[in-house]
Every structure is written in C-alpha cells, then in structure tokens.
Design a protein with these regions (language model features):
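Short, contiguous strand/loop micro-motifs
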Residues: 3-4, 21-22, 83, 122-123
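A local structural motif
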Residues: 1-12, 22-26, 107, 145-152
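Pocket-lining segment of extracytoplasmic ligand-binding domains
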Residues: 14-101
Length: 160
C-alpha cells in the first residue's frame, strides 16, 4: 500500500480502540501499552511491529529558556530517569503493579507492555537526529505538518 491508498483517521487512543473494536476502522497504528492491550483484550494481531522500518523513540522535552537557564536540573533529571529505568527493567512485575492501575490495564498487560520498552535514557545522538529529520521531512512532504522543521535546532546540547 502507498500513503494515497489509505484513509487516515487521527484519533486519540481510547477513541481509536473503540473504532477498531466496532469495525469503524480496519487497522490501527498504535504504541504500547495500547497495542499490548489490544492484543490481550480484543484479540488484535500485530501485522507489522516497525522493527527495521522505523525506530521508536521516546523524548523528554523542556522549553528552550528552561534548558538554557537550568541545564544542571536537566542533567540531574536525566540521571534520575536512568536510575528509575534500571529499577523498572529489573522489576517488571512490581512496576506493572504500579503502572497498570494508573493506565487502567491489568497487571499482566502492563507487564507485557513494559517488557517491550527500551530502557536507558540518553542524549540524542547524531544518528537519532538524522532519523528524526528524515521522518520530519517525510511528514512535511505528505503535508502532515505545516512546514519543514530542523530537528537539530531543537535538540538540547548540554555544555560539558
């Protein structure tokens, strides 16, 4: 399929799940924990997981003025995230028992979703910036975003 062969519906996850369950949409592109919930609770099957097609990253963001005036806080926050990541990764069951109720999922589904994540927050590498730029350019070419953006211009580069 090409982009022009499909009709996109931009829905928030809860609305998208309802549309998927009722057959209002034929397919659903979604991330964890929603994908794990759809497989476990709705009987959905994963058609493509994105491995090799698109890398999935999570980003922590701050305003430019904040990052310029408080780099020490951001550095500390990044280290604390790494510490928490290590704990979560080595205590998936306990983490799922905490996260599951917060997102309205059974512990086993939350544990499956947590098991899919890549842990270990790090600063953006040049490789990640290049990949994100390619994606941003594709979105711009498809007119999914209103104008071209420069990914590198918004990446935090702390002073060493």
């Amino acid at each position: 399929l090409k982009y022009g062969d499909i009709q996109l519906s931009f829905l928030k996850p809860s609305d998208a799940r309802a549309a998927f369950e009722t057959g209002a949409v034929d397919a659903w592109v979604i991330w964890d924990p929603y994908s794990s919930a759809a497989v476990a609770q709705v009987g959905a099957r994963v058609l493509v997981d994105g491995v090799g097609a698109a890398d999935n990253y999570n980003f922590y963001i701050a305003t430019k003025p904040y990052s310029e005036h408080h780099p020490d806080v951001l550095t500390l926050a990044l280290e604390e995230i790494r510490i928490n990541d290590r704990w979560i990764e080595s205590h998936l069951k306990e983490s799922a028992a905490i996260v599951g109720p917060q997102v309205g999922l059974p512990d086993d589904v939350a544990e499956t979703a947590l098991g899919h994540y890549a842990y270990g927050a790090q600063l953006l590498t040049g490789d990640v910036v290049v990949k994100q730029q390619k994606m941003a350019d594709a979105f711009s070419d498809l007119e999914l975003i209103p104008k071209k953006v420069s990914i590198d211009s918004v990446v935090w580069h702390p002073a060493h």
